[in-house]
Amino acid sequence: ELWRHVGPDMDVPAGDIGVGGREVGYMFGMYKKLTHEFTGTFTGKGLEFGGSLIRPEATGFGGLYFVKHMLDKKGIDIKGKTVAISGFGNVAWGAATKATQLGAKVVTISGPDGYIYDPDGISGEKIDYMLELRASGNDIVAPYADKFPGSTFVEGRRPWEVKVDIALPCATQNELNGEDAMNLINNSVLCVGEISNMGCTPEAIDAFIEHKLMYAPGKAVNAGGVATSGLEMSQNAMHLSWTAQEVDEKLHQIMHNIHEQCVKYGTEPDGYINYVKGANIAGFMKVAHAMMAQGIVLSLIHISEPTRLGMIS
Protein backbone atom coordinates (compact mmCIF):
# COMPACT_ATOMS: atom_id res chain seq x y z
CA GLU A 1 0.00 0.00 0.00
CA LEU A 2 2.87 2.40 0.75
CA TRP A 3 3.99 2.58 -2.88
CA ARG A 4 0.84 4.53 -3.84
CA HIS A 5 1.85 7.35 -1.52
CA VAL A 6 5.50 7.80 -2.47
CA GLY A 7 7.16 9.10 -5.61
CA PRO A 8 9.83 11.54 -6.83
CA ASP A 9 7.26 14.35 -6.93
CA MET A 10 5.20 13.23 -3.94
CA ASP A 11 7.00 11.83 -0.91
CA VAL A 12 10.59 10.55 -0.86
CA PRO A 13 11.57 8.13 1.94
CA ALA A 14 15.21 8.07 3.07
CA GLY A 15 17.35 6.54 5.78
CA ASP A 16 17.50 7.45 9.47
CA ILE A 17 18.21 5.70 12.77
CA GLY A 18 17.70 1.98 12.13
CA VAL A 19 17.19 2.47 8.39
CA GLY A 20 20.30 2.24 6.23
CA GLY A 21 21.25 1.35 2.69
CA ARG A 22 20.03 -2.24 3.06
CA GLU A 23 16.52 -1.26 4.11
CA VAL A 24 16.29 1.49 1.49
CA GLY A 25 17.48 -1.03 -1.11
CA TYR A 26 14.77 -3.53 -0.17
CA MET A 27 12.05 -0.88 -0.39
CA PHE A 28 13.37 0.52 -3.66
CA GLY A 29 13.51 -2.96 -5.18
CA MET A 30 9.89 -3.68 -4.30
CA TYR A 31 8.83 -0.22 -5.51
CA LYS A 32 10.40 -0.95 -8.90
CA LYS A 33 8.58 -4.28 -9.13
CA LEU A 34 5.24 -2.63 -8.41
CA THR A 35 5.63 0.45 -10.62
CA HIS A 36 8.00 -0.77 -13.35
CA GLU A 37 9.84 2.55 -12.98
CA PHE A 38 13.37 3.55 -12.03
CA THR A 39 13.02 6.97 -10.39
CA GLY A 40 14.51 8.91 -7.50
CA THR A 41 11.72 7.87 -5.16
CA PHE A 42 14.07 6.63 -2.43
CA THR A 43 17.38 8.20 -1.41
CA GLY A 44 20.33 6.69 0.36
CA LYS A 45 20.42 3.90 -2.23
CA GLY A 46 23.49 1.84 -3.02
CA LEU A 47 25.91 3.24 -5.60
CA GLU A 48 25.17 0.29 -7.88
CA PHE A 49 21.56 1.38 -8.42
CA GLY A 50 21.33 5.14 -8.34
CA GLY A 51 22.86 6.15 -5.03
CA SER A 52 25.06 9.20 -4.57
CA LEU A 53 28.59 9.56 -3.36
CA ILE A 54 28.88 11.52 -0.09
CA ARG A 55 25.30 10.60 0.93
CA PRO A 56 26.20 8.48 4.01
CA GLU A 57 28.41 11.22 5.47
CA ALA A 58 26.43 14.19 4.11
CA THR A 59 24.68 15.13 7.36
CA GLY A 60 27.98 15.32 9.21
CA PHE A 61 29.74 17.09 6.34
CA GLY A 62 26.97 19.67 6.05
CA GLY A 63 26.94 20.23 9.80
CA LEU A 64 30.63 21.08 9.83
CA TYR A 65 30.25 23.43 6.87
CA PHE A 66 27.50 25.28 8.75
CA VAL A 67 29.55 25.47 11.96
CA LYS A 68 32.56 26.75 10.01
CA HIS A 69 30.39 29.55 8.58
CA MET A 70 29.20 30.40 12.11
CA LEU A 71 32.78 30.73 13.29
CA ASP A 72 33.88 32.59 10.17
CA LYS A 73 31.11 35.13 10.77
CA LYS A 74 32.75 35.95 14.10
CA GLY A 75 36.27 35.93 12.68
CA ILE A 76 37.20 32.65 14.38
CA ASP A 77 39.28 30.03 12.56
CA ILE A 78 38.10 26.46 13.01
CA LYS A 79 41.66 25.17 12.59
CA GLY A 80 43.10 23.91 15.85
CA LYS A 81 39.79 23.99 17.70
CA THR A 82 38.81 21.01 19.86
CA VAL A 83 35.52 19.28 19.11
CA ALA A 84 33.24 17.07 21.22
CA ILE A 85 31.09 14.74 19.13
CA SER A 86 28.44 12.38 20.45
CA GLY A 87 27.48 9.13 18.76
CA PHE A 88 29.59 6.92 16.51
CA GLY A 89 27.31 6.21 13.56
CA ASN A 90 27.15 7.71 10.08
CA VAL A 91 26.46 11.24 11.28
CA ALA A 92 29.25 11.24 13.88
CA TRP A 93 31.63 9.58 11.41
CA GLY A 94 30.87 12.21 8.76
CA ALA A 95 31.24 15.03 11.28
CA ALA A 96 34.56 13.68 12.58
CA THR A 97 35.88 13.20 9.05
CA LYS A 98 35.02 16.73 7.90
CA ALA A 99 36.13 18.35 11.17
CA THR A 100 39.53 16.72 10.72
CA GLN A 101 39.71 17.82 7.08
CA LEU A 102 39.01 21.40 8.18
CA GLY A 103 41.84 21.27 10.70
CA ALA A 104 39.91 20.80 13.95
CA LYS A 105 40.68 18.12 16.54
CA VAL A 106 37.88 15.72 17.51
CA VAL A 107 38.43 14.46 21.05
CA THR A 108 35.23 12.55 21.90
CA ILE A 109 32.74 10.05 20.54
CA SER A 110 30.03 8.32 22.56
CA GLY A 111 27.60 5.44 22.74
CA PRO A 112 24.88 4.12 25.07
CA ASP A 113 27.63 2.77 27.33
CA GLY A 114 29.49 6.07 27.83
CA TYR A 115 32.00 8.20 25.97
CA ILE A 116 35.58 8.09 24.72
CA TYR A 117 37.97 10.96 25.44
CA ASP A 118 41.04 10.95 23.21
CA PRO A 119 43.23 14.03 23.81
CA ASP A 120 45.47 13.07 20.89
CA GLY A 121 42.55 13.49 18.50
CA ILE A 122 40.27 11.07 16.67
CA SER A 123 41.53 11.03 13.09
CA GLY A 124 42.83 8.67 10.40
CA GLU A 125 42.49 5.03 11.38
CA LYS A 126 40.63 6.05 14.53
CA ILE A 127 37.81 7.50 12.43
CA ASP A 128 37.80 4.35 10.31
CA TYR A 129 37.51 2.31 13.50
CA MET A 130 34.22 4.10 14.26
CA LEU A 131 32.75 2.24 11.28
CA GLU A 132 34.05 -1.06 12.65
CA LEU A 133 32.42 -0.33 16.00
CA ARG A 134 29.11 0.40 14.30
CA ALA A 135 29.32 -2.66 12.05
CA SER A 136 29.93 -4.91 15.08
CA GLY A 137 26.31 -4.42 16.13
CA ASN A 138 27.27 -4.19 19.81
CA ASP A 139 26.35 -0.49 20.11
CA ILE A 140 29.24 0.26 22.47
CA VAL A 141 32.36 2.44 22.25
CA ALA A 142 34.37 1.00 25.15
CA PRO A 143 36.57 -1.18 22.84
CA TYR A 144 38.04 2.02 21.36
CA ALA A 145 39.98 2.64 24.59
CA ASP A 146 41.44 -0.88 24.45
CA LYS A 147 42.57 -0.44 20.86
CA PHE A 148 44.05 3.06 21.16
CA PRO A 149 46.27 3.65 24.22
CA GLY A 150 46.10 7.19 25.55
CA SER A 151 42.34 7.38 25.20
CA THR A 152 39.92 7.02 28.12
CA PHE A 153 36.50 5.42 28.34
CA VAL A 154 34.11 7.15 30.75
CA GLU A 155 31.24 4.81 31.57
CA GLY A 156 27.65 5.97 31.76
CA ARG A 157 28.31 9.65 31.09
CA ARG A 158 27.97 12.07 28.19
CA PRO A 159 30.84 13.94 26.50
CA TRP A 160 29.53 17.42 27.31
CA GLU A 161 31.55 17.57 30.53
CA VAL A 162 34.79 17.74 28.51
CA LYS A 163 36.26 21.23 27.97
CA VAL A 164 36.16 21.86 24.22
CA ASP A 165 35.73 24.72 21.77
CA ILE A 166 32.92 23.17 19.70
CA ALA A 167 30.16 20.76 20.77
CA LEU A 168 28.30 18.71 18.16
CA PRO A 169 25.42 16.44 19.21
CA CYS A 170 25.35 13.73 16.53
CA ALA A 171 23.50 10.83 18.15
CA THR A 172 19.82 11.19 19.00
CA GLN A 173 17.14 13.52 20.34
CA ASN A 174 17.33 15.22 23.74
CA GLU A 175 20.90 14.05 24.28
CA LEU A 176 22.11 17.42 25.58
CA ASN A 177 20.08 18.77 28.52
CA GLY A 178 20.12 21.93 30.60
CA GLU A 179 22.81 20.64 32.96
CA ASP A 180 24.99 19.65 30.01
CA ALA A 181 24.47 23.09 28.50
CA MET A 182 25.69 24.80 31.66
CA ASN A 183 28.74 22.52 31.73
CA LEU A 184 29.61 23.65 28.21
CA ILE A 185 28.93 27.31 28.99
CA ASN A 186 31.03 27.21 32.17
CA ASN A 187 33.83 25.57 30.18
CA SER A 188 33.73 28.49 27.69
CA VAL A 189 32.53 26.54 24.66
CA LEU A 190 32.52 28.73 21.55
CA CYS A 191 29.86 27.06 19.45
CA VAL A 192 27.20 24.34 19.60
CA GLY A 193 25.89 22.85 16.36
CA GLU A 194 22.92 20.50 16.66
CA ILE A 195 23.64 17.90 13.97
CA SER A 196 21.29 15.28 15.41
CA ASN A 197 17.52 15.85 15.16
CA MET A 198 16.35 17.79 18.22
CA GLY A 199 19.59 16.89 19.99
CA CYS A 200 19.19 19.63 22.60
CA THR A 201 16.37 19.90 25.12
CA PRO A 202 14.37 23.16 25.34
CA GLU A 203 16.17 23.94 28.62
CA ALA A 204 19.55 23.60 26.92
CA ILE A 205 18.50 25.82 24.02
CA ASP A 206 17.19 28.48 26.40
CA ALA A 207 20.49 28.45 28.29
CA PHE A 208 22.54 28.85 25.12
CA ILE A 209 20.46 31.77 23.88
CA GLU A 210 20.32 33.42 27.31
CA HIS A 211 24.13 33.38 27.44
CA LYS A 212 24.39 34.67 23.85
CA LEU A 213 26.24 31.54 22.77
CA MET A 214 26.67 30.59 19.13
CA TYR A 215 24.05 27.86 18.90
CA ALA A 216 22.31 26.62 15.76
CA PRO A 217 19.36 24.18 15.65
CA GLY A 218 19.18 20.91 13.76
CA LYS A 219 16.66 22.22 11.23
CA ALA A 220 19.54 24.30 9.81
CA VAL A 221 22.71 22.47 10.83
CA ASN A 222 21.71 18.96 9.76
CA ALA A 223 20.11 19.96 6.46
CA GLY A 224 23.06 18.46 4.59
CA GLY A 225 21.52 15.00 4.62
CA VAL A 226 18.25 16.12 3.06
CA ALA A 227 20.13 18.41 0.68
CA THR A 228 22.23 15.54 -0.60
CA SER A 229 19.10 13.42 -0.96
CA GLY A 230 17.95 16.15 -3.31
CA LEU A 231 21.25 15.95 -5.15
CA GLU A 232 20.79 12.18 -5.44
CA MET A 233 17.35 12.74 -6.96
CA SER A 234 18.82 15.25 -9.42
CA GLN A 235 21.40 12.70 -10.55
CA ASN A 236 18.67 10.07 -10.97
CA ALA A 237 16.50 12.45 -13.01
CA MET A 238 19.40 13.29 -15.34
CA HIS A 239 20.78 9.73 -15.38
CA LEU A 240 24.14 11.07 -14.22
CA SER A 241 26.61 10.16 -11.50
CA TRP A 242 28.55 13.09 -10.08
CA THR A 243 31.99 12.72 -8.52
CA ALA A 244 32.43 13.00 -4.77
CA GLN A 245 34.03 16.41 -5.28
CA GLU A 246 31.07 17.66 -7.32
CA VAL A 247 28.56 16.53 -4.71
CA ASP A 248 30.66 17.95 -1.87
CA GLU A 249 30.98 21.34 -3.57
CA LYS A 250 27.22 21.53 -4.16
CA LEU A 251 26.58 20.52 -0.55
CA HIS A 252 28.95 23.22 0.70
CA GLN A 253 27.16 25.87 -1.35
CA ILE A 254 23.76 24.77 -0.05
CA MET A 255 24.94 25.00 3.57
CA HIS A 256 26.43 28.43 2.85
CA ASN A 257 23.07 29.61 1.51
CA ILE A 258 21.19 28.23 4.53
CA HIS A 259 23.60 29.99 6.88
CA GLU A 260 23.14 33.28 5.03
CA GLN A 261 19.36 33.02 5.43
CA CYS A 262 19.69 32.32 9.15
CA VAL A 263 21.95 35.36 9.57
CA LYS A 264 19.56 37.53 7.55
CA TYR A 265 16.56 36.78 9.73
CA GLY A 266 18.28 35.99 13.03
CA THR A 267 20.57 38.98 13.60
CA GLU A 268 19.35 41.01 16.56
CA PRO A 269 19.92 44.74 17.27
CA ASP A 270 22.85 44.01 19.59
CA GLY A 271 24.57 41.97 16.88
CA TYR A 272 23.85 38.55 18.39
CA ILE A 273 22.77 36.02 15.77
CA ASN A 274 19.83 34.01 17.08
CA TYR A 275 20.05 31.04 14.74
CA VAL A 276 16.86 29.49 16.13
CA LYS A 277 14.90 32.62 15.27
CA GLY A 278 16.68 32.95 11.94
CA ALA A 279 16.03 29.35 10.89
CA ASN A 280 12.36 29.51 11.93
CA ILE A 281 11.66 32.77 10.11
CA ALA A 282 13.65 31.79 7.01
CA GLY A 283 11.74 28.52 6.74
CA PHE A 284 8.40 30.22 7.27
CA MET A 285 9.08 32.98 4.76
CA LYS A 286 10.10 30.51 2.07
CA VAL A 287 6.87 28.54 2.46
CA ALA A 288 4.70 31.66 2.79
CA HIS A 289 6.14 33.28 -0.33
CA ALA A 290 5.67 30.07 -2.31
CA MET A 291 2.06 29.73 -1.15
CA MET A 292 1.20 33.31 -2.06
CA ALA A 293 2.95 33.08 -5.42
CA GLN A 294 0.82 30.04 -6.24
CA GLY A 295 -2.43 31.81 -5.49
CA ILE A 296 -3.08 30.95 -1.85
CA VAL A 297 -4.73 33.92 -0.15
CA LEU A 298 -3.45 34.63 3.35
CA SER A 299 -5.73 37.12 5.04
CA LEU A 300 -4.72 38.76 8.30
CA ILE A 301 -2.67 35.81 9.50
CA HIS A 302 -1.07 36.86 12.78
CA ILE A 303 2.40 35.48 13.27
CA SER A 304 3.39 34.37 16.77
CA GLU A 305 4.79 37.19 18.92
CA PRO A 306 8.31 35.74 19.38
CA THR A 307 9.04 36.08 15.65
CA ARG A 308 8.38 39.84 15.69
CA LEU A 309 7.09 39.61 12.13
CA GLY A 310 3.72 41.27 12.68
CA MET A 311 1.24 40.01 10.11
CA ILE A 312 0.85 39.19 6.45
CA SER A 313 -2.27 40.40 4.67
Which residues does each PLM region occupy?
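Flexible, glycine/charged-enriched surface loops at secondary-structure junctions
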Residues: 6-15, 38-40, 74-82, 262-278, ...
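A glycine-rich phosphate-binding loop feature that marks nucleotide/adenosyl-phosphate handling sites
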Residues: 14-24, 44-46, 80-90, 113, ...
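Adenosine-phosphate binding glycine-rich loop
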Residues: 185-299
